[in-house]
């Protein structure tokens, strides 16, 4: 029936690094000062209609602050919440973190990998901000061909901050590319001013995965004009992508955005279920996804000061996960139960 780890009925990403490397690896969110091509006029202006990046990263991660300082402060921040964490992943999260010349990207990525407690990088970006040369470099980094002496230097790193030896199973820096795809529907992507198509996303994911780079994707549930049925229909397309992991976030209406004005003008254009309905909706999605796809997140949190309403109240992610486990058991269902190999193509 199902044989997922951690006693789950879905393929939870929780514990993935512990199983692979023998310890928990915590992410440190960084702001490296990037922008996006739909903000600076390259493919558009104003950015995505739902976006205010300040709502999505912690206080220690601020533009202009040196990256190694962000890492040190991030480690101190995370040690309060996760005191047993010993090594970290540098998470380039703000805006599009491959949007720049390759020489600049190399300098930034290799700078954070020089930190003695950082064992890998997670790069959040857009599918229209990668190319063959950038992906070849990342593949070389992940395989150990680039920075060939990195692991030896890390294991010999002096200093009181190093708490534990590097896992023996680690042979090169961990490299993950996480694409903001947001929707499989081109009409939605145009509506929210993304500036790229789903086919662009498909090609980027395929180019990344075929090089052996761990590849993830992010989707928003409830964008304007998308019905529950449309969101379920895209599960086949998501499963057809060579992704290792996926994140789902419910749409949150962030103050000061174009989408806040749009929502105020016509709330009926948005599918925004209450928490109870959302749990069933997420399960309906899980049932239709291929079972080997890791589920990294099923809901998002934004600090209350950034959102114009909180239909669920102040429910934390860990509580949502607890309720999800309970509901899966009540429905006696699991990830992939209704999965079938999708046909090729895309929705419009």
Predicted region positions:
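Conserved C-terminal portion of the radical SAM core fold
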Residues: 199-259, 276-299
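Auxiliary Fe-S-binding modules of radical SAM enzymes
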Residues: 2-15, 21-26, 253-348
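Distinct, well-ordered alpha-helical segments
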Residues: 102-110, 131-142, 231
């Amino acid at each position: 029936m199902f044989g997922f780890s951690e006693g789950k009925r879905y393929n939870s990403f929780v514990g993935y690094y512990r199983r692979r490397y023998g310890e928990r690896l915590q992410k440190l969110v960084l702001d490296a000062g990037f922008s996006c091509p739909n903000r600076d006029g390259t493919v558009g202006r104003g950015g995505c209609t739902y976006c205010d990046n300040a709502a999505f990263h912690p206080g220690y991660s601020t533009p202009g602050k040196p990256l190694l300082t962000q890492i040190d402060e991030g480690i101190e921040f995370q040690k309060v919440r996760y005191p047993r964490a010993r090594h970290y992943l540098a998470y380039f999260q703000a805006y599009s973190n491959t949007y720049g010349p390759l020489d600049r990207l190399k300098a930034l990525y290799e700078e954070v990998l020089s930190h003695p407690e950082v064992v890998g990088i997670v790069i959040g970006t857009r599918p229209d901000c990668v190319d063959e040369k950038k992906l070849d470099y990342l593949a070389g980094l992940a395989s150990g061909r680039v920075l060939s002496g990195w692991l030896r230097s890390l294991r010999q790193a002096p200093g009181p901050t190093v708490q534990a030896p590097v896992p023996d199973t680690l042979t090169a820096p961990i490299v993950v590319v996480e694409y903001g795809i947001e929707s499989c529907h081109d009409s939605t992507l145009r509506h929210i001013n993304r500036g790229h198509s789903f086919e662009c996303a498909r090609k980027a994911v395929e180019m990344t995965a075929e090089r052996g780079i761990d590849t993830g994707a992010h989707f928003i549930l409830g964008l304007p004009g998308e019905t529950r049925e449309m969101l379920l229909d895209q599960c086949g397309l998501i499963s057809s992508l060579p992704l290792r992991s996926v994140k789902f976030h419910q749409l949150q209406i962030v103050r000061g955005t174009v989408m806040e004005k749009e929502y105020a003008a016509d709330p009926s254009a948005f599918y925004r279920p209450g928490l109870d309905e959302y749990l069933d909706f997420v399960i309906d999605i899980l049932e239709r996804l291929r079972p080997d796809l890791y589920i990294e997140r099923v809901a998002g949190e934004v600090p209350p000061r950034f959102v114009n309403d909180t239909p669920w109240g102040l429910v934390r992610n860990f509580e949502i996960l607890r309720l999800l486990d309970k509901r899966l058991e009540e429905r006696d269902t699991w990830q992939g139960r209704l999965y079938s190999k999708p046909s090729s193509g895309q929705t419009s």
